[in-house]
């Protein structure tokens, strides 16, 4: 009983600290300005007074926890060691889960020009270790004499890609949490996921950690695309995570608890959705909002924070 009480107090304190002001998340460190999920991106976000650093985690063949949105070396972002690019149709060949970290480090993720992000600075960069990101961001915040940041960390798992792109959720969570606990940042961490399995593990085994349910609308077209890429996976595995086809209530049926944060695609947000989430005790932090006009519309609906590629919208 005492442990349950202390855990509750811990969560209340963490949420109070988290809720002092509108929560500004730099998506992948703010990919509009710097190469995504890299140390330079995170440091720039800290300089711009971002509240929370949003990032994605992947697991390598040798069980290193690294930052990567994609489960493979993306043809859109990556330059090979010889200076050439990965062919567009062969991205899945370079699966992170099949590669040791030392090999991944030989590929560059900061030099290739991205047409969708013309303001992104080009520089040599590699996919960093999660532990190095924490060490760097903690030290840089102190150097800037700024409050230590929150970390919004996505577990990049899906029921249909276990043992293909990542280990099973339990192993993924344990590898990640070992680093979080070692670095002592539990009170400033949010674990977000589209995969309810990882959130359930966090809730049951690491109850002090805040969680966020990521939500997107999965229609028949999107479902067909997923099934095309994973032809040998049973169809039922593609329907084991929230699809928003039945609203907030339908999404929450995938969990045994109500998470502190509901994080939908911003196009799904309505005044009614925000009010429904607030009535359930959930904050609403949508993704990915990249214009000041859309930010104002969402703030007028009462959202609690936002995830953006472009930290300049908060200026």
Language model features with spans:
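Bacterial Sec-dependent N-terminal signal peptides
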Residues: 1-22
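Phosphate-group recognition and catalysis centered on beta-loop-alpha active-site segments
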Residues: 19-315
């Amino acid at each position: 009983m005492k442990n349950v009480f202390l855990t509750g107090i811990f969560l209340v304190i963490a949420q109070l600290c988290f809720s002092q002001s509108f929560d500004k998340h730099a998506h992948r460190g703010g990919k509009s300005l710097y190469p995504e999920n890299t140390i330079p991106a995170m440091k720039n976000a800290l300089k711009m007074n971002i509240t929370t650093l949003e990032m994605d985690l992947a697991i390598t063949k040798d069980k290193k926890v690294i930052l990567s949105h994609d489960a493979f070396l993306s043809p859109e972002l990556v330059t090979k060691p010889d200076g050439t690019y990965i062919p567009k149709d062969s991205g899945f060949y370079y699966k992170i889960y099949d590669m040791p970290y030392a090999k991944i480090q030989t590929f560059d993720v900061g030099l290739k020009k991205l047409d969708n992000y013309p303001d992104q600075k080009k520089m040599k960069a590699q996919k960093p270790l999660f532990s190095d990101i924490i060490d760097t961001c903690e030290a840089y915040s102190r150097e800037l004499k700024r409050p230590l940041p929150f970390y919004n960390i996505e577990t990049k798992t899906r029921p249909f890609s276990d043992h293909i792109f990542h280990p099973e959720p339990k192993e993924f969570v344990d590898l990640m949490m070992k680093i979080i606990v070692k670095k002592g940042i539990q009170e400033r961490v949010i674990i977000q996921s589209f995969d309810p399995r990882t959130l359930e593990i966090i809730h049951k085994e690491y109850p002090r950690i805040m969680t966020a349910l990521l939500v997107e609308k999965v229609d028949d077209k999107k479902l067909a695309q997923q099934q095309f890429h994973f032809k040998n996976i049973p169809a039922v595995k593609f329907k084991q995570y929230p699809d928003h086809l039945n609203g907030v209530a339908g999404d929450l049926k995938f969990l045994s608890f109500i998470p502190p944060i509901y994080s939908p695609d911003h196009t799904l947000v309505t005044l009614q959705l925000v009010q429904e989430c607030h009535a359930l005790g959930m904050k609403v932090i949508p993704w990915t909002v990249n214009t000041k006009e859309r930010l104002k519309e969402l703030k007028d609906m009462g959202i609690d924070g936002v995830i953006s590629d472009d930290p300049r919208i908060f200026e």
